[in-house]
């Protein structure tokens, strides 16, 4: 129901990841032992954090729809809107969980999730 807010929230994904990436990389030169934690370790670690973050985000979004701790953003919608929103979150979460190894870019994930949410919304 709130397309502008949804676009803003999806945009936060790329903003948050970019802030983490820049901050972590700026702190990397101060690591404990550069002989053990090489620059190759940095790239591998950031890639793993991205994969884990996408998987966790997908699981958390599913849990907030199916589990006991429902999200007020969806629960307070009118019933006809709630159904489409919940379906969209579940489908976007499934996409994130199943395709996270193919593309870990925050902007790519946000774009695909946005397309799914638009396709499943009800009016």
Provide a role label for each language-model segment.
Residues 1-31, 57-73:
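Active-site activation/catalytic loop segments of kinase-like enzymes and analogous catalytic loops
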Residues 10, 40-123:
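ATP/Mg2+ or Mg2+-diphosphate-binding catalytic cores
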